[in-house]
């Protein structure tokens, strides 16, 4: 900082101190120290975070050490259950239940249209997730909920609607919406980690050629260019790995699962290329490269 009337480096200390903004200086110093020692702590403890750090400053001031606590989420340990067995059991049970429902409906002259005797993809994913043992880091759930809330706010703004109006229309409080998002986040994260572990356990692999073929099949002229981006390529790869796992399970179950036409499969591939990779997928890519 330069003080008027004094050459650089020759101004009295008391005048220099008066010209400075203490809050601004402290903020810059804290930011610099956190950035330096946070990275060092990760390397020293061999930690690979999958979330942004939650920083708490516990000591900072003149003539005292700078101390802070950084809380991060790491990939949880996942113990898979016998999901193929539980999926088969659920599929058999659903077929038996549907048979009874159809018999009852026929006797009562009701429609059979809404009675389904096949497992659907989301039910298979639920079984894989629910049969697994894992503990999802609270900080990761909070981060996911914050992302859902931000997305909701953006959607309301695009409709020229305030959040208060949305809440009144839904007859809900912000806390209730956040509670619903918390349940959704826990469910989605559980499924994500369980599927990733199942893919790893079954040694499912996706080649570069398969990723390129997916890009071509999407019908998007920009798709081949998009997969040159490492994050997009990793995201598409993860979608194809999941599809391979589910296809393998469906083939084993035979007629106990709902049919998926080639048209729907191509649609899913196209969507995988059009969707923007999430923060998690980018972090996972960094982790994979370590």
Question: Which role does the model predict for each range below?
Answer:
Residues 1-290:
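FKBP-type peptidyl-prolyl cis-trans isomerases
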């Amino acid at each position: 900082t330069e003080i008027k009337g004094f050459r650089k480096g020759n101004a009295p200390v008391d005048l220099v101190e008066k010209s400075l903004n203490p809050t601004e200086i402290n903020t810059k110093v804290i930011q610099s120290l956190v950035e330096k020692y946070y990275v060092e702590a990760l390397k020293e403890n061999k930690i690979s975070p999958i979330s942004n750090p939650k920083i708490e400053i516990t000591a900072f001031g003149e003539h005292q050490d700078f101390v802070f606590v950084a809380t991060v989420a790491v990939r949880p340990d996942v113990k898979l259950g016998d999901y193929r067995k539980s999926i088969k059991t659920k599929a058999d049970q659903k077929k038996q239940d549907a048979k009874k429902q159809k018999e009852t409906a026929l006797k009562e002259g009701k429609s059979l249209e809404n009675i389904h005797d096949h497992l659907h993809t989301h039910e298979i994913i639920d079984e894989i997730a629910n049969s697994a043992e894992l503990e999802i880091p609270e900080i990761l759930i909070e981060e996911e909920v914050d992302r859902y809330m931000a997305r909701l706010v953006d959607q309301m703004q695009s409709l020229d609607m305030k959040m208060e109006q949305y809440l009144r229309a839904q007859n809900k409080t912000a806390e209730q919406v956040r509670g619903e998002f918390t349940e959704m986040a826990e469910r989605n994260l559980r499924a994500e980690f369980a599927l990733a572990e199942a893919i790893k356990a079954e040694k499912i692999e996706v080649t570069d050629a398969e990723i390129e073929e997916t890009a071509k099949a999407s019908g998007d002229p920009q798709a081949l260019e998009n997969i040159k981006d490492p994050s997009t390529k990793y995201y598409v790869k993860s979608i194809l790995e999941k599809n391979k796992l589910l296809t393998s399970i469906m083939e084993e179950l035979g007629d106990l699962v709902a049919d998926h036409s080639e048209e729907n499969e191509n649609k899913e591939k196209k969507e995988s290329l059009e969707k923007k990779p999430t923060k998690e997928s980018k972090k996972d890519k960094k982790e994979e490269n370590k």
